[in-house]
Amino acid sequence: MTNNMTRDQADKIAASIRQKYSEVAKNPEGQFQYPTGRKGLEALNYDKGLIDKLPDAVASFYCGVGNPFSIGKINPGEHILDVSCGAGVDTILAAMMAGPNGSAVGVDIVPEMIARAESNLKMTGIDHARFQATAGENLPFPDDWFDVVISNGAINLIPDKERVLTEIHRVLKPGGRLMVADQIGAGSVQKDFEARLASWFQ
């Protein structure tokens, strides 16, 4: 493991992520220190024409920390992977941009989030997106498969960042793009693991 973290410690973090986000899958309102739902999408300057196409019930589950699409555009016909997709709002928006000749796949380790993402997808009627329960560190896709990989507020939660970035590089086509919106910690890192675990989501 990287960051001098043991496997048991990494497993504890994964369990805490599953616990928190299984609750977020029920209702993200009040779970974060920043705007969520349609207000979050608008505050982060997502394309109004796209977010207006989202049913309110889908938009309400947006809980990203930034706008990965502000980094670059998704072109029609491209194939996109969303790492740690949560409720799938960014995945769905990517599928809209890619159009019917493209595709979008969202992966997440939280089964409840995948179930929510699939429910959200059904409400949109989009048929060129799908979701899969898997970890970003073990992507079940061939080499050179995707044109774009996106991630929103998630890589910071993954203990083994070197491994997840290596996997992302593997599945990206040569010349592919990585578009990440995320947050970082400021100040000193807690030395005690239990204190680090308690502050993992702050």
Language-model segments: what does each one mean?
Residues 99, 162-179:
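A short glycine-rich, Lys/Arg-flanked "PGG" loop and its adjoining helix->strand segment in the class I
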Residues 76, 137-148:
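A short acidic, Gly/Pro-enriched loop at the edge of an enzyme's catalytic core
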Residues 80, 149-150:
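Hydrophobic beta-strand segment of the Class I
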Residues 34-79, 90-97, 116:
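Conserved alpha-helix/loop element of class I SAM-dependent methyltransferases that forms part
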Residues 2-44:
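N-terminal auxiliary segments of SAM/dcSAM-dependent transferases
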Residues 124-138:
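Conserved SAM-binding strand-loop segment of SAM-dependent methyltransferases
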Residues 184-202:
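Short, glycine-/aromatic-enriched active-site segment of Class I SAM-dependent methyltransferases
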Residues 110-112:
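Conserved SAM/SAH-binding beta-strand->alpha-helix loop
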